[in-house]
Amino acid sequence: MENAKVALVHDWLTGQRGGEKVLEVFAEIFPDAPIFTLFHFPGSQVEKIEERIIKTSFLQKMPFLQKRYRWYLPFFPLAVELFDLQEFDFILSSSHCVAKGAIPRPDALHISYVHSPVRYAWNQYFAYFSPDRLGFFSRRIVPPLIHRLRQWDVMSLTRVDHFFANSKTVARRIYRYYRRKAEVVYPPVDTELFQPSDRQGDYYLLVSALVPYKRIDLAIAAFNRNGLKMKIVGMGPDHKKLKKEAHA
């Protein structure tokens, strides 16, 4: 594999979170590898990624993408399958949605580093699509769409030679839903960014993306009951809903 042509595949580049931190490390390891991603919001990534060759799918030109990219979920499998990876000997995908479903050349090696199987299709389906989150029309169209996504998700497993998981929990999910074993490789950690402090505050701190699967609502409910202070740092689509629950 010394002279192998390498491609990196990542679901999408819309902000800087855990998956993108891992992709940043992959980009350092393979400095010449282009990045294939469904869509990219320019300026949303660190310079190491922004300066790379980034190849996007047809979704990049869809209307209202920046504010409503989740609307295009039914097209994600098709978009990743249309990436032409025939010139690459080694595919390294960073996947929490459809990146693992990229189609490699028959003799190419495909390793997928999985942050989680598709949460809203499997273990977190009801966190995303509970009845109180869906309107009349959505309650009729979402279940069959997610059913199709599950079918594709399982079918595309054969395109991956080896799975790696970012934790033992994710490795168990991979086996539960995919019946594939995954080796655990923990994500890189910047141990110099934070230093222990002798000062102690009078509140708890929660730092997270404000998305359904993080279950910030449970933490808010707990602190509403116990009377202790908690500060929440983060952004995401659940911001208004959670702020209302926190009486902030």
Language model: regions and residue ranges:
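Short donor-sugar binding/catalytic loops of nucleotide-sugar-dependent glycosyltransferases
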Residues: 12-13, 207-211, 236
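Active-site donor-binding segments of glycosyltransferases and PAPS-dependent sulfotransferases
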Residues: 29-100
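Active-site proximal beta-strand in glycosyltransferases
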Residues: 90-93, 104-135, 183
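Membrane-proximal helix-turn-helix segments that form the acceptor-binding/catalytic region
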Residues: 130-163, 171
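Acidic anion/phosphate-binding donor-loop and adjacent secondary structure
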Residues: 172, 176, 183, 188-202
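Nucleotide-activated donor-binding/catalytic signature segment of Leloir-type glycosyltransferases, i.e.
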Residues: 240-248
